[in-house]
């Protein structure tokens, strides 16, 4: 399997010591999903603009699938990514969207062609940064970085380890009923990055 080059280059997080810490209690029987706003990431210095939109979409889908989060509709957003970078976060306006947490990010293309991905998680009511990290990676690895960021957000807000940066190994079966071909395959937990590990010539139980 190809070696994955992923470098964590910076830890930006601070624990918010608010009167009531923003946290989902996963031990409760019935949980109301937490409203969370996940903005597009700001693309700087030649960074891929498509990725700046695709990464937040993957993060949003991951968190929503967990059943613990309810992403705010982007049409309700009160600031663009450019506005956040230039003016800072206008927390009072974000509170009007009912979002309890806010995710922002920045993509930068480095001189050696790699991509620097930075994200920050904010408590909208205390106006505090809850956590944040930056990663150096290849552009083609953007989807995995989105899963890693999803895990960081999930852990910070639930206290439990995330599972989004995990992969599923399974037996793929196809062909006519009398000549079925079984191959060992692997994919991300969300069904993307599917690859076959065997060619179907050998027996797979």
Would you name each region that the model predicts?
Residues 7-15:
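Bacterial N-terminal signal peptides
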Residues 22, 85-152:
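Amphipathic beta-strand/beta-sheet edge segments enriched in Tyr/Trp
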Residues 27-90, 103-108:
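Short beta-strand->alpha-helix linker/helix-N-cap micro-motif
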Residues 104, 168-173:
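Residue position within the beta-strands of beta-propeller blades
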Residues 112-116, 176-185:
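Structural motif
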Residues 125, 188-192:
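Short loop/turn segments that connect beta-strands within beta-propeller blades
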Residues 129-132, 192-196:
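Predominantly a core beta-strand signature of beta-propeller blades
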Residues 142, 156, 194, 201-205:
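Conserved beta-propeller blade repeats
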């Amino acid at each position: 399997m190809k070696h994955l080059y992923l470098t964590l280059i910076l830890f930006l997080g601070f624990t918010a010591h608010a009167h009531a810490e923003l946290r989902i209690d996963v031990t409760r029987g019935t949980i109301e999903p937490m409203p969370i706003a996940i903005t597009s990431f700001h693309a700087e210095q030649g960074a891929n603009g498509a990725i700046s939109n695709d990464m937040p979409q993957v993060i949003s889908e991951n968190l929503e699938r967990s059943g613990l989060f309810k992403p705010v509709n982007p049409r309700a957003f009160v600031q663009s990514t450019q506005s956040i970078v230039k003016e800072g976060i206008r927390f009072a306006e974000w509170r009007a969207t009912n979002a309890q947490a806010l995710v922002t990010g920045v993509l930068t293309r480095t001189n050696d062609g790699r991509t620097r991905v930075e994200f920050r998680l904010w408590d909208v009511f205390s106006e505090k940064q809850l956590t944040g990290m930056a990663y150096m990676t290849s552009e083609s690895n953007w989807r995995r970085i989105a899963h890693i960021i999803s895990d960081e957000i999930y852990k910070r807000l639930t206290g439990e380890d995330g599972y989004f940066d995990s992969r599923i190994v399974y037996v793929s079966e196809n062909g006519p009923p009398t000549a079925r071909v079984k191959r060992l395959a692997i994919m991300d937990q969300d069904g993307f990055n599917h690859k076959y590990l065997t060619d179907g010539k050998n027996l797979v139980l």
